[in-house]
Amino acid sequence: VTQTAEDQRLHQARTGQADWRQWGPYLSDRQWGTVREDYSPGGTAWDYLPHDHARSRAYRWGEDGIGGISDLGQTLCFALALWNGRDPILKERFFGLTNDQGNHGEDVKDYYFYLDNTPTHSWMRMLYRYPQGAFPYADLLGENARRKSDPALPEYELVDTGIFDGDRYFDVTLDYAKRTADDILIRITVANRGPEAAPIWLLPTLWFRNTWSWGDAPKPRLWAEGDAAILTAHPDRPAMRLDCPGADALLFCENETNTARLWGQAGPAWPKDGINDHIVSGAATVNPAQQGTKAAALWHREVPAGGTLSITLRLSAATSGGGLGPDPAGLMATRLAEADAFYAARLPPGTSPDRARIARQAHAGMLWSKQFFHYVVADWLEGDRIPPPGGRERGRNHGWRHVHASDVISMPDTWEYPWFASWDLCFHTVVLARTDLDFAKEQVLLLMREWYMHPNGQVPAYEWAFDDVNPPLQVWAGLQIAEYEQRTTGRLDTAFLRRLLDHGLLYFTWWVNRKDAEGNNLFQGGFLGLDNISVFDRSSGYLPGGGRLYQSDGTTWAGFFALQMMQAAMLLARVQPDHHELAAKFFQHFALIADAMDHLGRESQGSADLWDEADGLYYDVLRTGDRFVPLKVRSLVSLLPMIAVADLDLAALEASDNPAFAARIAWFRRRQADLFGKIAGSEGQAEHRLLVSLVDRDRLQRLLRVMLDPAEMLSDYGIRSLSHRHLADPFRVEIGGDAFGIGYWPAESQSGLFGGNSNWRGPIWMPVNVLLIDALRRHHRHYGEAFTVECPVGSGRMMTLDQVADELARRLVAIFEAGQDGRRPVWGGAARFQQDPGWRDTLLFYEYFHGDNGAGIGAAHQTGWTGLVAVLIEDLGRAANPASAPARRHAKAPAPVAAGR
């Protein structure tokens, strides 16, 4: 990869020459309503600290704001607040509905877009669309409450209220540019899109996270220097200054709870909402001495119709000398040009401008979604100066007292999901590796570190329930990162791989001991991240008739995990030959798991099995007593076994310095020929290659016949999570006198299961599609050009598996691409987004997508795993121009070179 100015900054950060990552977009979009801030008796996090309290109540564990930044430990924070003269409160944070208020669960209602960002955050840009009329808080709450009774009704969005009619809104753009690691220029540009002049109050705000109200930590201080600068003093942080030339006034209060407003008790004279009350109501709630722990610079201006207002600030070390420094506009332009060069070097030549825009905004969303996550479970359970409610010691996450989270983590969505999710994070790292290998490696290992991983080896799922089980993707993601680094730099980071394998061993041991309840290598799994894809709530522990559910995907994930561990050990064995023994161990473990896929057939005398020979699909099986009931739901669960695959070059292994692994496979082939035949075959493009897989050639063809059928799983925009066939033919089953069923819902969920904001019963989900694409390429590497399938089924077009993978990638990318009419499928029927050029190209990366038309659904800023579209665009560009960039993901890698971290 070309060494751009941004690459040089990454090198400086890696080698300790400059701490470029010290400041970044680590402020959450929402801290209220989180588990961390919940001290209620019943664990009702959304109600304990609601949006209406957020402006008045000091947070215990983090901060939030609009387009904000903080230092790595979130000691000092900066964000933008605004007022249009009509809202009942300042716009200090984005507004959205809680899980109970939204008709499909929690839902942010403000419109904001992450447009640009670099991995050192030397350049960042985001856009917020602020209505000029009074923000319709009551209308959004009331209408969505009315619609909640019928989940088939669409969500009532901000644009539906009419607040943007006549273009009466401001486009507010925040730009950040770093001169040095601790010298940051901030430009705020307000564009009046309306037909009339309109007032705006801008209040860029600097404050300290409250660390002093809960214990003995000393209280920091902000104060005014003259009329255009705010200075900081903190016992543990370097002194900083915020220069605000041209501000009308500097306003100060304390980041402390307004106990008088909330509980009628005496409290601070200038509380957290003091600036809000002063601006909106004229209250005497700002400190006339111009000092405190929260401060804002005020600009009150009239912006003419079609006109713009721009202000520039500078956050820098107290020793910087003050002012904006030399040529602030030139610095902004330079950092933008450097960002252009950085991203141009990461896309193959020939990538269309539209795809380049999509990829860049996807990367921007990934980088903006870094968040400081603070949660010390022991302290949280015990409470602070005020004792927590009784019974808390046995409440949520009480078995995870060792967790001491105080890290910057890539979030799924910093408003709807402002907490880590273990399997989401794995997908994030695959995208992050394209821009920041060091950060990606740290992130993929993070939840397996001792301050997160349970002593028994379990990885925490997410703050609502650390005990839940997510698919074990950490080693897969780590291998993706290592392969990408080796392909693009020629280095194999064996130090990273050793850490990955060591932590993975602990997790694998927990997985097989905990989730294999009967010791037969069939895995119950539980939740496994696919929310409502099952007929039953798999995380509840309840099954009809007190039965046991044998999950096709649970066993698949276990086999997948074993293969990833085997491949990691094989990579390390290139430089540490003793790892061949570990690789052989995981090969054998995979074989036993694969054999268990047929275990039910033996135990039930052929009456049930995970593989259904007649349908050519895998199904979950429910056992109640001596009865085995296949749950014939045609879903991603049916297809997932194809992802457990590895293609081995036996000739290369035999020719290596330590051919022990090849010898072990040869022994296994001789001694356990029947079992070996189930999982491994050499029928392909070369006899020296061995395919290790849960599915043989025949089963793969049959699975693909369903997966690539437009009447079943194949949409114009990727693979559906549930077959379209279930629209006309819903699955029904009766067990113990109770009826259960599942139907095709291509859009939002029609039930309240898992809060109602997630749906795996029809929509397209980017992460599992990417796993399927990856598996197709690995199968192709073995079978080669001779293995073709009809794609789509019924078209008469025959494709190799590599071509099918490219076709699926194109369909997923097409969700975001503008057609000849300029319309983007992601926007669905939203007229303003489809027709207004100012809205059409500022993209949102939704959680999942309509199974028929590709419209975005769910969390609007889940760039996390949906950011994988950037990887797909890169891969498609390399496929179209194989000579223009490093080899594709599965080409033969260069020789290993040990690399430290």
Q: What kind of region is each of these model predictions?
A:
Residues 1-56, 74-76, 83-901:
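Acidic, mature catalytic/reactive cores of soluble proteins
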